[in-house]
């Protein structure tokens, strides 16, 4: 999803401004086609307001001639004349209010409907795109696309009906002025084009600056989200000042761009305020001369002057619209870049029947990723590459992997860091598709299964657990139609029932953002309960119990084997106790299956496997010794 840098976004000239204007009109046309009825009511209200506004000047002129001047001349007026004048003014005010209410209400309705529609469209697209796409785009940028860019795209819809009504008003006003006095009409015909010319000049000047400001908004959002999301790393490494400076620099660039826009508006607005007033002055000067010659009467002069006064605000609406168009085009482009993004995986219409564990098989499975992305989320090895084909070198992470796992078996995937274990788990659940080869469930190619078929039978518990800011019940059920008994059963299987039962509100306990009120092991056990509550036929654990006490981990894995769940279990394992519980061990090294068998068989015949398991044990012993030393030191400190 390539998007302009802030500096590129600010570049431009007359040709670019013309293109921005034309493309802005196309964006508005999309909205008009999307909400024709609502737009029609808003334009009707704006046109009613415009027509009554022009009519009000005629009413004021008639009142001047028939009520005010006779009252000054004779010192009195009739009740009938006063009643008629009051009724006319009341009718004018009432119809103007109706038109204004319809215009504002339905313009807002149109704007907010389009924003909601495209926010939903962006969110749906995000959920359909594969992980590889998300790993290539910062979360802050995605948030900006769904919020600030959608708002900017449809910002011009607020003044749009007013602009259409203003065009109608100018047409009626021009006819009224020509009928009243062609000479005074010429004065207006000089002022109005000048106002339009100033609006066009302003739009050309402000367009590149407003475009750059919109791009900088996304940049600020990206930096802020990255800093907040990495708060733990920032604090532990003492990088608060560096991150503050980075955010400050981005915020200052946005501030400077917005100040430039403000300065331009500061020069533009006074001119737009002054010109209509100068037009009124010109009308009065020329009108006094015309009045002295008897060409017009006092009421017609009042009518013309009042009309000029009323037209200043509608004319300014053109400036508001033109000023919003550059940001609208930038927002629209960024939203469309998301909606047009490629990478969504095709699905077939196949279904999976049966019960019990899945027969899982892979045939010639190979996968490569774009350089700069890794499977742990620091980038991604899950590249879907159509967008970036040819732009990056690719590194093979899995090559010709063949597996056959019988239903109900537990298989441990063991291998050194970077051997492709996590990538394999994402391929097994079809979070990405392989470059070559096939993954089969009960003999069926997963690419031929209907959408939702895989998630209906398989569950993946990843390395990094995610806990929603919600209740424990909703975190475990996560939208599934399960009873509280099912939730408690899943919690017991994940050995999470004891700590949940100890909480004051039990299942109704609300967890903080990302489950910060829980320990790492508790979060992992909740994630495991979330997976097993759906009673999957295939359960994949990607180092999903690394933060759990080894004894508890052994109980969990033993429970998975003994339960009636009877799922096929694939576990990425690092602890010897975990590996020993598996029916079979697959040793993965440099993206290739180098050996497979029981734990004892691999220890006996695979030197690489033996070295790796020994290293795991040594690291575990060192961590245990360090924890024991820390506990002893804390006990001694407390005793003192």
Regions found by a protein language model. Give the residues of each.
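ABC-type nucleotide-binding domain
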Residues: 355-640
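An intracellular "coupling" helix at the cytosolic face of ABC transporter transmembrane type-1 domains
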Residues: 30-36, 131-132, 148-160, 205-216, ...
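Alpha-helical segments in transporter systems
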Residues: 37-58, 89, 154-166, 188-189, ...
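Helix-loop-helix
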Residues: 70, 176-190, 264-333, 338-339
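Membrane-integrated ABC transporters
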Residues: 1-53, 68-85, 95, 103-107, ...
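Transmembrane helices of ABC transporter permease
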Residues: 34, 38-48, 95, 161-212, ...
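Juxtamembrane helix-loop junctions of ABC transporter transmembrane domains
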Residues: 11-21, 44-45, 52-65, 88, ...
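Short intracellular "coupling" helices and adjacent cytoplasmic loop segments at the cytosolic face
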Residues: 4-16, 112, 120-144, 148-150, ...
């Amino acid at each position: 999803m390539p998007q302009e840098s802030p500096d590129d976004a600010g570049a431009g000239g007359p040709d670019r401004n013309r293109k921005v204007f034309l493309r802005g009109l196309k964006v508005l046309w999309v909205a008009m086609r999307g909400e024709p009825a609502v737009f029609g009511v808003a334009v009707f209200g704006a046109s009613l307001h415009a027509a009554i506004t022009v009519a009000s000047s005629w009413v004021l002129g008639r009142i001047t001639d028939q009520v005010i001047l006779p009252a000054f001349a004779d010192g009195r007026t009739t009740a009938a004349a006063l009643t008629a004048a009051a009724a006319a003014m009341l009718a004018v005010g009432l119809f103007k209010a109706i038109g204004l209410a319809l215009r504002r209400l339905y313009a807002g309705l149109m704007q907010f409907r389009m924003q909601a529609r495209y926010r939903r469209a962006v969110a749906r697209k995000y959920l359909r795109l594969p992980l590889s796409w998300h790993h290539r785009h910062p979360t802050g940028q995605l948030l900006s696309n769904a919020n600030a860019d959608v708002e900017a795209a449809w910002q011009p819809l607020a003044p749009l009906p007013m602009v259409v009504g203003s065009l109608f008003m100018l047409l009626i006003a021009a006819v009224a002025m020509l009928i009243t006095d062609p000479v005074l009409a010429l004065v207006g015909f000089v002022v109005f084009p000048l106002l339009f010319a100033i609006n066009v000049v302003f739009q050309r000047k402000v367009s590149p600056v407003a475009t750059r400001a919109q791009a900088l908004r996304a940049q600020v959002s990206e930096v802020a989200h990255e800093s907040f999301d990495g708060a733990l790393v920032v604090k532990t490494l003492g990088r608060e000042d560096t991150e503050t400076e980075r955010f400050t620099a981005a915020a200052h660039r946005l501030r400077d761009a917005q100040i430039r826009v403000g300065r331009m508006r500061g020069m533009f607005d006074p001119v737009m305020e002054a010109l209509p007033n100068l037009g009124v002055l010109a009308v009065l000067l020329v009108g006094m001369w015309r009045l002295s010659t008897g060409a017009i009467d006092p009421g017609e002069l009042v009518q013309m002057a009042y009309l000029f006064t009323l037209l200043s605000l509608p004319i300014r609406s053109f400036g508001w619209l033109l000023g919003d168009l550059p940001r609208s085009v930038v927002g629209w482009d960024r939203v469309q870049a998301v909606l047009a993004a490629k990478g969504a995986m095709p699905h077939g219409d196949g279904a999976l029947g049966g019960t019990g564990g899945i027969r899982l098989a892979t045939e010639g499975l190979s996968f490569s990723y774009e350089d700069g992305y890794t499977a742990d989320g620091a980038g991604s090895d899950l590249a879907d590459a159509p967008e970036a084909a040819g732009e990056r070198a690719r590194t093979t992470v899995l090559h010709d992997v063949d597996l056959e796992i019988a239903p109900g078996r537990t298989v441990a995937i063991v291998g050194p860091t970077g051997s492709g274990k996590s990538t394999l788990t994402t391929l097994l659940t079809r979070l990405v598709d392989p470059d070559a080869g096939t993954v089969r469930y009960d003999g069926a190619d997963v690419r031929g299964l209907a959408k939702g078929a895989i998630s209906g039978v398989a569950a993946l518990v990843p390395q990094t657990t995610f806990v929603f800011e919600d209740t424990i019940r909703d975190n475990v059920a996560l939208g599934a139609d399960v009873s509280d008994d099912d939730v408690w059963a899943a919690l017991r299987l994940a050995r999470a029932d004891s700590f949940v039962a100890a909480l004051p509100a039990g299942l109704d306990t609300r967890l903080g953002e990302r489950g910060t009120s829980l320990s790492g092991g508790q979060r992992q056990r909740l994630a495991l309960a979330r997976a097993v509550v759906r009673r999957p036929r295939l359960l994949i654990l990607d180092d999903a119990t690394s933060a759990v006490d080894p004894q508890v981990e052994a109980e969990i894995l033993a429970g998975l084997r003994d339960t009636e769940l009877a799922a096929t279990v694939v576990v990425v394992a690092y602890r010897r106790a975990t590996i020993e519980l598996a029916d079979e061990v697959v040793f993965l090294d440099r993206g290739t299956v180098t050996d497979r068998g029981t734990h004892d068989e691999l220890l006996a015949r695979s030197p690489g496997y033996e070295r790796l398991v020994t290293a795991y044990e040594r690291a575990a012993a060192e961590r245990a010794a360090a924890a024991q030393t820390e506990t002893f030191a804390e006990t001694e400190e407390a005793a003192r």
